[in-house]
Amino acid sequence: KVDGYLQRSWHAESSVLKKENYSFKLAKTPDDKEPVKYTADEVESIEYVEKTEAHPDGIRWEALDIASPGLKDRYRTFRRLVCLNKASQNATTYWWKIWTTERVGNIDRRVLKTVYGIRFHDDPDRTVYPYMLVNTMLVEKQHPGLQKFCKTWFKGSEGKVRKKEAKENDAWMLDMYDAYLAAQADK
């Protein structure tokens, strides 16, 4: 455990050379001239001890592997710092920010976006899957039927209600996963 003051954070910066959500600098005092650099590979978590109105319990960032499939390896992961969003008995959701490129007319511009992901508590690798990857073949080996269950979650009359709730609740994936586990237990 290291206590200190954050001098340069890990958040996604506009610099194209710095890895997003990966490294940060911590100083022993606010005036310290020699901060120490840490990376997501070296830390387990970061906990803010100063509480704010929006986060009365402080904010916890964890260093975890994020699923990032590629052409050569569909199970590739990157170690990054992700913010704990909400935890349940069976899974935990996280968020982090990334830079993406959007086309506006004839101009490409960089946009900062928030990505949400889920870590299943029974996953031995502790991998965080971005929401958009949960309904792919990546989770099928460990959670048979989850891919199909996820694709039908927003279908039908109940699905329309769930879709409306999902826009207001960014941790909707926890409810979907609990429903999937309940359906598996009934089989």
Per-segment meaning from a language model:
Residues 153-187:
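C-terminal partner/receptor-binding element of secreted or periplasmic proteins
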Residues 1-2, 187:
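Sec-dependent signal peptide cleavage junction
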Residues 2-157:
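Aromatic-patch recognition
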